């Protein structure tokens, strides 16, 4: 019962990048943090549970383990994810499925596991990490953009399902962030000649933007502050720059929006 008066929080993908920084920020704010990832990279004051979010049984087992010890789960932050880049024509179906299995269905697995307990306790907060790429449809990053768009649509609908039970669902749209995500991305420039060099140019632009992106520690603190809110919004966009970009993508005529994206990444 150590966590009776502290928030009990799960962070997926907590071994690196945004997940790790978020877990650290939550710990520093006084939360009891459980980190789900396949790799155990110890962090003081944070409990690691070896969980592959694509393994539904492993997720369910880990959540039950937390409930047995803490009796509640206050919040979940779904950070686990990775990216693939390359032309759709040259991306295998297995690669595309792997992208969705982690980014989308991994999030679904974790949320399904915690929802019965949150519904029973009459409160909870699910935070799903999306991306500005969900609304700015980036060529040669098609499956990543699609997986994040799926997260956003799913989150809006889920909010309507669970709001009557005191459960909040929040989407956090992120832009370019300087983490190991760039190095971890599965990159392919297959077909670059057929596409007139556009694949390599687009991938290079993405990598440049990420290497000059926001500090992940700032993002971790930003997400930790959302967890503290009593009445969180359904959508937050990190930084004024990306808030403006996200808004533009949502209000501009589709033809204008796509022309801008094509000019930058096409």
Regions found by a protein language model. Name each.
Residues 164-233:
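SDR active-site lid
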Residues 131:
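Residue(s) in the substrate-gating loop at a strand-loop-helix junction
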Residues 79-84:
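Conserved NAD(P)H cofactor-binding loop of Rossmann-fold oxidoreductase domains
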Residues 15, 23:
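N-terminal Rossmann NAD(P)H-binding glycine-rich loop of SDR-like oxidoreductase domains
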Residues 50-61, 93:
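The beta1-alpha1 cofactor-binding region of Rossmann-like NAD(H)/NADP(H)-dependent oxidoreductases
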Residues 87-88, 95-97:
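Substrate-binding pocket helix/loop in short-chain dehydrogenase/reductase
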Residues 111, 147-150:
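Active-site helix of classical SDR
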